[in-house]
Regions:
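Generic beta-strand/beta-sheet core signal
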Residues: 81, 223, 300-302, 325-328, ...
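Phosphate-binding/catalytic loop of phosphoryl-transfer enzymes
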Residues: 203-230
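Glycine-rich phosphate-binding loop plus the immediately following alpha-helix
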Residues: 44-46, 161-189, 225-265
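Phosphate/oxyanion-binding active-site loops and adjacent basic polyanion-contact surfaces
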Residues: 48-56, 269-280, 329-334
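Nucleotide/phosphate-binding catalytic cleft detector across ATP-hydrolyzing
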Residues: 1-21, 25, 29-77, 82-208, ...
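Conserved phosphate-binding/catalytic loops in two-lobed NTP-binding clefts
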Residues: 314-346
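Extended hydrophobic-aromatic, low-complexity segments
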Residues: 222, 230-232, 242-245, 307-311, ...
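Adenine-nucleotide phosphate-binding core of ATP-dependent small-molecule kinases
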Residues: 248-251, 257-298, 303-304
Length: 376
């Protein structure tokens, strides 16, 4: 965590909004996360603004009851997996003779961002420069980790972007702003939940694939050399597995799954576990070809709570080794959000402070000062 690294001791409220549940806690405090059933939000879209607003209020009031410090004025970070998310890669080149300076790097990042905004007309939820190349004085194009100070005729950068439809984001943002105002919370920020989780895991793991199985979809995030290499949205979620079980005659999938996998029972309501496992395996196998066998898989999402037997079943269906199961994601998500802010100057990540129309540098300075207690 940030405090253990000596990087600050600030606190912030973090809320993870999903289609099945909404979770929240105060990061940097030993506060047990509060979790409630979701409402008004399905498949990454707002379906009932009033209901979602009520649910967020219920969650925040629940957090305030278990956190003794008071939530008024705390910065709040919402993490969410939006529907209609588009993942793109974009490349730009600028002249940089005689050598690459910090100004060149800043200019090409801004060029990447502005080009994507102008072409796609969508909100940029996340952005990272994943590759730099220089054209050296011998006209050789070379990939480099950090181009600053190198002699080069030109600098090329490739960025990875997560884009969200403007209408989808604005509907969501208006609800969050109302909730923020009602509970007198501090500054507000929005991040992608799977990216935040992957960034939090980078502190403990190197190259890996994060398999984040949500209620209506699965997000597969590949991390290579500390950077995001892939981000895929797969049409498989808990609801699809539940529907498959219902089709097999299992009327209460939630209870049955919890009982069979967590308690390791042989029989539940006259259901043969092998029949249940066979149905789940068929659904999980649909995404097996999307996962590389070269890197360990980290498993997260609601099904991560079902215990060792589900992990074994998942490994069998995917043909991949599950190296870690994330049963408590809030710590990793909070760590990931913090890490992305601190790495901004190094890897090109640009956080999105959508609630305030101010400069990017101003947003970063605010987070460092107010959230993390770091003075320049």
């Amino acid at each position: 965590l940030l405090s253990s690294k000596g990087q600050g001791n600030g606190k912030f409220l973090i809320v993870d909004i999903g289609a099945y549940s909404i979770k929240g806690t105060v990061f940097e405090e030993s506060v047990h996360p509060v979790e409630i059933r979701s409402g008004g939000f399905d498949k990454g879209y707002v379906t009932d603004a009033k209901k979602l607003k009520e649910k967020l209020g219920e969650l925040i009031e629940g957090i305030s009851r278990v956190y003794s410090g008071g939530i008024e004025g705390l910065p709040v970070i919402f993490v969410v997996s939006f529907g209609g998310t588009e993942v793109i890669s974009h490349e730009e080149t600028i002249t940089s003779s005689p050598r690459v300076t910090r100004e060149h790097i800043s200019r090409i990042k801004n060029l990447l961002e502005n080009s994507v905004k102008n072409v796609h007309q969508k909100e940029i939820l996340w952005f990272e420069v994943v590759e730099y190349k220089i054209l050296n004085l011998d006209n050789q194009k070379i990939e480099v980790e950090n181009p600053e100070g190198l002699s080069a005729k030109s600098l090329t950068a490739r960025g990875f972007f997560l884009l969200v439809p403007k209408g989808t984001f604005s509907d969501f943002l208006s609800i969050l702003q109302d909730v923020k105002a009602k509970y007198k919370l501090g500054k507000m920020y929005v991040f992608d939940s799977s990216i935040s989780l992957a960034y939090g895991l980078k502190e403990d793991f190197e190259d890996f694939d994060l398999l984040d199985i949500g209620h209506t979809s699965t997000r597969l995030v590949g991390i290579r050399s500390g950077k995001v290499s892939t981000y895929q949205i797969l049409n498989l979620g808990g609801i699809h597995i539940h529907n498959a079980l219902k089709s097999a005659g299992i009327l209460n999938p939630d209870q049955t799954l919890q009982t069979i996998f967590s308690r390791d029972s042989l029989k539940v309501a006259n259901i043969d576990p092998t029949v249940l496992e066979s149905n789940i395996s068929l659904r999980l196998a649909e995404i097996s070809g999307k996962i590389s066998n070269m890197f360990p898989v980290i498993f997260a999402g609601g099904f991560a709570r079902l215990g060792g037997r589900f992990k074994i079943l998942l490994e069998s269906a995917l043909g991949s080794r599950i190296s870690h199961v994330v049963e408590s994601p809030m710590v990793y998500i909070g760590r990931g959000v913090s890490r992305m802010v601190f790495e901004e100057s190094k890897n090109g990540y640009k956080s999105q402070g959508f609630s305030v129309p101010r400069s990017f540098s101003g947003i970063i300075e605010f987070i460092k000062r107010e959230i993390m207690g770091k003075e320049e």
